[in-house]
Amino acid sequence: MKLKPIEVAEILQKEIANINCLSELEEVGQVITVGDGIAQIYGLANVKSGEVVEFKSGVKGLVLNLENDSVGAVIMGDDNQVQQGDNVKRTKEVLEVPVGKALLGRVVDALGNPIDGKGDIASKEYRHIEMKAPGIIERTSVSEPVQTGIKAIDSLIPIGRGQRELIIGDRQTGKTAIAVDTIINQKQAHSLTNESDKIYCIYVAIGQKRSSVAQIVKKLEDAGAMDYTLIVSATASEAAALQFIAPYSACSMGEYFRDNGMHALIIYDDLSKHAVAYRQISLLLRRPPGREAYPGDVFYLHSRLLERAAKMSEAKGSGSLTALPIIETQAGDVSAYIPTNVISITDGQIFLESELFYKGVRPAVNVGISVSRVGSAAQIKAMKQVAGSVKLELAQFRELESFSQFGSDLDPATKAQIDHGKRLVEILKQAQYHPFPVEEQIVSIYVGTKKYLNDVPIQKVKEFEDKMLTEIRLNKKDILESIKNEQRITEETEQKLKAFLENFVKKFVK
């Protein structure tokens, strides 16, 4: 059989056309050393800082150090699966996490993978974990309140949407309790249909015990608060790299709400452990240590995170992201490195004192050194009307109280002021997991400031408050409704309230 040259050419052309020549170029390096969650890699010449690399076992790493002859990466997972000599691939991607409403009600790890056993998360959108904070023009001033449901905070240290308010105190003083109460208190707004009233909550557990996180999840489920809450967990047993990236991942999840005209609240519990995780990574990467062995950029670590909380302008959809970072102090030392850093970044702080806590003043807020630098603009008028003088009265009471320890015979005016102060302290006490609606808080504080409690024995103040609120809910609901709707105490409402209280005090004292 004789083949014609033209036929041969046609066959060859067909075969060439069918050849799949889509070859992929991969940049591959090798692990030189591995240990303590850090891998030194040789051969990735074009890798970028912050890029994700993939090890042979499928474990991911995050490049943080670019050196002359090698690259330092933190391993996001089990470093036992990475061995010396393993190949490492560039992915040419930066870290991304799933965002959106599909995450609500779920517990995820620092990379956004579900860890609650409820199946996959059907999220359509992903965001980078490191996003630039909004610029000056894109923001507007804080003007709407975030109601925590805690009398001592909503009246004296008000928090606004888009604010960053630090909760600081020793261990076991009730820092997490304030945060959890604030989440539970948003349930009331979520029962309404108006989207602008709702605040979606994100709780980030950094370096905590797994049992503590499980307890918080259970508490939120029991209170029906998980429907609008997302929990990001990077517990103490997880890699330092995951504890380091958890707040940034959670912040990106919160920014989804902020940038889509909704409102979100994010709680970082706590940034002391976050700084410790970052210090561990930095020292293992052989970066030079500074004060308290923290690296030089530990301020930037927290500032770039907290600057992402903002109240957006109308042109940008008027959304907001409010941040409540938590810092744990050692023996009340607020002047340590990390506490002073975070105090200077935030818009105020709620300082919790162990001494007050042990005295039974709970929440143990030290009103003297707690401030809210921007929140008063967000406080509703009714609260301003009743709470304006409370801070001063409490400060005077503390001063007179310490003074009265030395002098036994006090003049009647001083004694009356001390008694009034003690009753104010009592009225600001509150049980855990029992947030109050703002209109009920206003009535309670009105009772305290207008001296209706003068005839009530101090040990019966809580009983008086409980009975008074029960009575007003049942028989004088119009007073509460008026305060809630008008957002101020009108003359008519005040007359009704005065008449009700005078009557109630007489009955109670009898």
Swiss-Prot record:
It comes from the Bacteria. One of its GO terms (molecular function) is ADP binding. It is an enzyme of class 7 (translocase). Keywords: ATP synthesis, ATP-binding, Cell inner membrane, Cell membrane, CF(1), Hydrogen ion transport, Ion transport, Membrane, Nucleotide-binding, Translocase, Transport. Coiled coil: none annotated. SUPFAM superfamilies: C-terminal domain of alpha and beta subunits of F1 ATP synthase, N-terminal domain of alpha and beta subunits of F1 ATP synthase, P-loop containing nucleoside triphosphate hydrolases. Its EC number is 7.1.2.2. GO terms for cellular component: plasma membrane; proton-transporting ATP synthase complex. It is a peripheral membrane protein. Produces ATP from ADP in the presence of a proton gradient across the membrane. The alpha chain is a regulatory subunit. F-type ATPases have 2 components, CF(1) - the catalytic core - and CF(0) - the membrane proton channel. CF(1) has five subunits: alpha(3), beta(3), gamma(1), delta(1), epsilon(1). CF(0) has three main subunits: a(1), b(2) and c(9-12). The alpha and beta chains form an alternating ring which encloses part of the gamma chain. CF(1) is attached to CF(0) by a central stalk formed by the gamma and epsilon chains, while a peripheral stalk is formed by the delta and b chains. This is ATP synthase subunit alpha. It comes from Rickettsia massiliae (strain Mtu5). The gene is atpA.
